[in-house]
Amino acid sequence: NMIVGTKTWSYTNDLPSVRLGVTDYSKCKPNGTHGATNEEVKRYIDFAAKNGLQEVLVEGWNEGWEDWFGHQKLDVFDFVTPYPDFDIKMLNDYAHSKGVKLMMHHETSSAALNYERHMEDAFNLMNKYGYDAVKTGYVGDIIPRGEYHYSQLMNNHYQRVIETAAKHHIMVNAHEATRPTGICRTWPNLVGNESARGTEYEAFGGNKSYHTVMLPFTRLQGGPMDYTPGIFETKLSEWSNNKSYVHTTLCGQLSLYLVMYSPLQMAADLPEHYEKYDDAFQFIRDVACDWDDSKYLEAEPAKYITVARKAKGTDNWFVGGKTDAARTAVVKLDFLDKGKKYACAIYQDGKTADYEKNPKSYQIIHKTVKKGDVLKINEARGGGFAISLLAK
């Protein structure tokens, strides 16, 4: 909602500037577009609980968003003070009562030193209310000026965040941070990074259709990526004033849960869009995020990729295929266990699917398969497919 402009991170339009500890939001008029309200967050919690999703990420919960971007201010956020319409205790209690957790969000506005000053208090607050993961953000030019997102100062900063979070038993999903280089092997609480153009760029003109079949060969070689997939209503103009569109088909979005490896995955569309395409959403309900094995079945950089992954601690497999140009994927099920049968659900592009002309055309095929079977699957231009293979 915020990315396309139907909601805002900010609470009010009354403030041209914000001063930490001085600005009194209780005297401000709400703007009516603030996204992180008690009512809206509870709606998302209910949806997550109903569909087996573990956490709800809430952005724009804390004071300071009226003055966060473009001014290169050091002291905008303290990361502990919620807006008047966000009851942090009530919402966490409500989420826990539903078997769901809230995920914390710390947008730093690239004021790294300010974040470090407040980090202990911010993580203590998370421990107090039961948060176990934080999405950090570094939008805008780095403060102090003259530093860059990839500079030594910032690499040292990202490392301090990871290590401090680990002491608090907190997982980190860093956005706009430096490209990881395997550090998650040493610090496994780094469960995700953006560090490349993710789905949010689809609202700003879009990523080319080959983008998602290039990243597995480049960005993802250094560690997991939070690509924020799962957009079903790909024509943004159909539900907002944004004229951009997502450069994949609906099934192409499903494939990203396998192609874009991350032990932390987002379902980035609106609940009402998932309810509209509930049969396709079943794959997101089913797909795992942690794996015992991965096999790359076919791949060509910037052209196509097909990967199969075995869900951790189970005999279940999931397969995702993504393409730039239209093609027929050939999936050989040689990786399945001999002697077992699998309930196979194939989510594939429809015959007339195309990421620009007909992105929501899809079909779901159910069958029983075994080791050695071969599946031939249609992939549309900018499309893809997803398969669940559940051991019987």
Give the residues covered by each predicted segment:
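Aromatic- and carboxylate-enriched substrate-binding clefts and catalytic-loop regions
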Residues: E59-Y245, T249
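Conserved, mostly hydrophobic/aromatic
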Residues: A48, V172, V259, V319
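Generic beta-strand/beta-sheet core signal
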Residues: G21, V58-E59, M103-E107, V134-V139, ...
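Catalytic cores of secreted or luminal carbohydrate-active enzymes
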Residues: C251-E298
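Carbohydrate-binding surface patches
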Residues: E300-A343, F385-A386
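Solvent-exposed beta-strand/loop surfaces of large extracellular or lumenal domains
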Residues: I346-G372
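C-terminal beta-strand-rich structural cap/linker in extracellular carbohydrate-active enzymes
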Residues: I365-K392
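Conserved structural scaffold segments of CAZyme catalytic domains across common CAZy folds
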Residues: N1-K98, H106, G384
